[in-house]
Protein backbone atom coordinates (compact mmCIF):
# COMPACT_ATOMS: atom_id res chain seq x y z
CA UNK A 1 0.00 0.00 0.00
CA UNK A 2 1.20 3.48 -0.83
CA UNK A 3 2.29 5.78 1.98
CA UNK A 4 2.77 8.98 0.02
CA UNK A 5 -0.32 11.11 -0.57
CA UNK A 6 0.30 11.57 -4.30
CA UNK A 7 0.79 7.82 -4.74
CA UNK A 8 -2.55 7.17 -3.02
CA UNK A 9 -4.21 9.64 -5.37
CA UNK A 10 -2.60 7.98 -8.40
CA UNK A 11 -4.02 4.62 -7.29
CA UNK A 12 -7.53 6.12 -7.18
CA UNK A 13 -7.11 7.83 -10.54
CA UNK A 14 -5.77 4.66 -12.13
CA UNK A 15 -8.71 2.62 -10.85
CA UNK A 16 -11.17 5.18 -12.20
CA UNK A 17 -9.51 5.30 -15.62
CA UNK A 18 -9.27 1.51 -15.77
CA UNK A 19 -13.00 1.16 -15.15
CA UNK A 20 -13.82 3.76 -17.79
CA UNK A 21 -11.51 2.14 -20.36
CA UNK A 22 -12.97 -1.28 -19.61
CA UNK A 23 -16.48 0.09 -20.12
CA UNK A 24 -15.55 1.62 -23.48
CA UNK A 25 -13.83 -1.59 -24.66
CA UNK A 26 -16.78 -3.70 -23.58
CA UNK A 27 -19.26 -1.50 -25.45
CA UNK A 28 -17.01 -1.60 -28.52
CA UNK A 29 -16.84 -5.40 -28.48
CA UNK A 30 -20.62 -5.60 -28.07
CA UNK A 31 -21.28 -3.39 -31.11
CA UNK A 32 -18.81 -5.41 -33.19
CA UNK A 33 -20.52 -8.67 -32.18
CA UNK A 34 -23.94 -7.24 -33.12
CA UNK A 35 -22.54 -6.17 -36.50
CA UNK A 36 -21.03 -9.61 -37.15
CA UNK A 37 -24.32 -11.27 -36.14
CA UNK A 38 -26.14 -9.10 -38.69
CA UNK A 39 -23.59 -10.15 -41.33
CA UNK A 40 -24.15 -13.84 -40.46
CA UNK A 41 -27.93 -13.36 -40.69
CA UNK A 42 -27.49 -11.70 -44.11
CA UNK A 43 -29.38 -8.65 -42.84
CA UNK A 44 -27.96 -5.98 -45.13
CA UNK A 45 -29.89 -2.95 -43.84
CA UNK A 46 -29.16 -3.68 -40.19
CA UNK A 47 -25.51 -4.39 -40.97
CA UNK A 48 -25.11 -1.01 -42.70
CA UNK A 49 -26.68 0.80 -39.75
CA UNK A 50 -24.54 -1.09 -37.25
CA UNK A 51 -21.39 -0.47 -39.30
CA UNK A 52 -21.71 3.28 -38.80
CA UNK A 53 -22.06 2.79 -35.04
CA UNK A 54 -19.05 0.45 -35.00
CA UNK A 55 -16.92 3.00 -36.87
CA UNK A 56 -18.06 5.75 -34.51
CA UNK A 57 -17.21 3.62 -31.46
CA UNK A 58 -13.80 2.66 -32.85
CA UNK A 59 -12.95 6.28 -33.67
CA UNK A 60 -14.01 7.43 -30.21
CA UNK A 61 -11.98 4.71 -28.50
CA UNK A 62 -8.92 5.53 -30.62
CA UNK A 63 -9.30 9.26 -29.92
CA UNK A 64 -9.49 8.68 -26.19
CA UNK A 65 -6.46 6.38 -26.30
CA UNK A 66 -8.35 3.28 -25.18
CA UNK A 67 -7.26 1.39 -28.30
CA UNK A 68 -4.39 2.14 -30.67
CA UNK A 69 -5.32 4.11 -33.79
CA UNK A 70 -3.79 1.46 -36.08
CA UNK A 71 -5.88 -1.24 -34.40
CA UNK A 72 -9.00 0.85 -34.97
CA UNK A 73 -8.08 1.40 -38.62
CA UNK A 74 -7.41 -2.32 -39.12
CA UNK A 75 -10.76 -3.29 -37.54
CA UNK A 76 -12.65 -0.74 -39.65
CA UNK A 77 -10.99 -2.01 -42.81
CA UNK A 78 -11.73 -5.67 -42.09
CA UNK A 79 -15.32 -5.01 -41.06
CA UNK A 80 -15.88 -2.87 -44.18
CA UNK A 81 -14.54 -5.73 -46.30
CA UNK A 82 -17.03 -8.10 -44.64
CA UNK A 83 -19.86 -5.67 -45.33
CA UNK A 84 -18.84 -5.24 -48.97
CA UNK A 85 -18.47 -8.98 -49.55
CA UNK A 86 -22.03 -9.47 -48.32
CA UNK A 87 -23.51 -6.99 -50.82
Curated annotation (Swiss-Prot):
One of its GO terms (biological process) is translation. InterPro entries: Ribosomal_bS20, Ribosomal_bS20_sf. The keyword Ribosomal protein applies. Disulfide bonds: none annotated. Keywords: Ribonucleoprotein, Ribosomal protein, RNA-binding, rRNA-binding. Binds directly to 16S ribosomal RNA. This is Small ribosomal subunit protein bS20. It comes from Clostridium beijerinckii (strain ATCC 51743 / NCIMB 8052). The gene is rpsT.
Amino acid sequence: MANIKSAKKRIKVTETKTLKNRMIKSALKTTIKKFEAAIEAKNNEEAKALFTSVVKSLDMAATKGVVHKNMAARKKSRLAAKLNSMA
